[in-house]
Every structure is written in C-alpha cells, then in structure tokens.
Amino acid sequence: MAKLRVAYEYTEAEDKSIRLGLFLIISGVVSLFIFGFCWLSPALQDLQATEANCTVLSVQQIGEVFECTFTCGADCRGTSQYPCVQVYVNNSESNSRALLHSDEHQLLTNPKCSYIPPCKRENQKNLESVMNWQQYWKDEIGSQPFTCYFNQHQRPDDVLLHRTHDEIVLLHCFLWPLVTFVVGVLIVVLTICAKSLAVKAEAMKKRKFS
C-alpha cells in the first residue's frame, strides 16, 4: 500500500499544473462577476435604447457655465469653465421634444447640457470648442434627419447621439471569463487523467513482470 500511495503522489510539475488550473477556474468565475457588475449591466441598459430618426428643433446656449477638470501634468490638475449649449430634437419614436446628448457618459456627467468640450486650462478655448460644436449643429446638420437612440422607459426626455456600448461588449463579458474557466478545467482534468493513466500503466507493468 505504501508503494501504491507513493505512485499516486503528484510530481512538482503536476502540482503546479493543477494549481494553475484551479487559479484559472477561480479567475474565470471572479472575472465573470466583475465584468457583469461593471460592464454587463450598463451595456444592457444602453442596448435597450431604440434607434430613431431625429431632427434638430433648436440649438442655443442657456447662459449657464459649468466646471470641468483639466490635467497639466502628472501631479497637476485644475478646473476651468465651459458654457452650456442645448440641442433639442424631435425623435421619430415618440414624436416629442427631447434633449440631445453625445453619449451615456456625457448624459450622466452633465444631464443639463448637450455637449462637454475637452477641458482646457483657458476658458476661452472651452468656449471656442462649444461654439464650433454649436455652429456645426446649426449649419451642417440643420434640419437634416440623423440617427439617435431613445429609451422611452428610462429617459423619455433625452436622446443619445452615440451608444457607449454595443453587442461586442456583451460578447467579451461572457467570452473571456468562460475561456479562462474552461482552460482551467481542462488543465486540471488532463493533469489528473494523465497521472491516473501513468499509474495504471505502471501497475500493469509491475503485474506483468511480477
């Protein structure tokens, strides 16, 4: 029995292989929960928005300014200001007036405005960026219809110009944790099976020559 027990002991390489497999299994499960919490839920909410056709009703500054944070080096940060511009549109899904936003991130950052410029140290540069964006929607887009995204249940008074997430995000949320988990399981199973076959082969060899 002692000899049989020794035969079933794993070598250092086999032990490391099993440990690696278990680590990958745990990593796959943990990453699935992390991706599900950080990416999957926001992506599902974003994908619930319905594609619609929007036309511009009005483009105007409302006379309010908001602060943004700029960086000027590794340990250098500061705040500057930008004016608030609002673009109201009519969307084909609800046939109602709604405030346009660049994307979900911009909506959550400043739900009152349609655009947040790249934050610069000088307020004048922020103003110029907003003015250029405002002029684009007045002159280039005008009354031309464009694609927007509308969520009747969550935000009936807002529409998005771009989706932050798409179906690819959902694929990655499931694919990589699943691949990690499956690879871990395969490593553990193949290591155990290989050891079991080696022990059986050794036992048969001993019986043959005994």
UniProtKB/Swiss-Prot annotation:
It is a multi-pass membrane protein. Interacts with KCNMA1 tetramer. There are probably 4 molecules of KCMNB4 per KCNMA1 tetramer. Interacts with FMR1 (via N-terminus). GO terms for biological process: action potential; chemical synaptic transmission; detection of calcium ion; neuronal action potential; potassium ion transport; regulation of neurotransmitter secretion; regulation of vasoconstriction. Changing S17E: Suppresses its effect on KCNMA1 channel activation and on deactivation kinetics. It comes from Homo sapiens (Human). Residues 41-167 are extracellular. This is Calcium-activated potassium channel subunit beta-4. The chain crosses the membrane at residues 20-40, 168-188. GO terms for molecular function: calcium-activated potassium channel activity; potassium channel regulator activity; voltage-gated monoatomic ion channel activity involved in regulation of presynaptic membrane potential. Phosphorylated. Phosphorylation modulates its effect on KCNMA1 activation kinetics. N-glycosylated. A highly glycosylated form is promoted by KCNMA1. Glycosylation, which is not required for the interaction with KCNMA1 and subcellular location, increases protection against charybdotoxin. Treatment with okadaic acid reduces its effect on KCNMA1. The gene is KCNMB4. Changing N53A: Loss of N-glycosylation and reduced protection against charybdotoxin. Changing T11D: Suppresses its effect on KCNMA1 channel activation and on deactivation kinetics. Belongs to the KCNMB (TC 8.A.14.1) family. KCNMB4 subfamily. Glycans are attached at N53, N90.
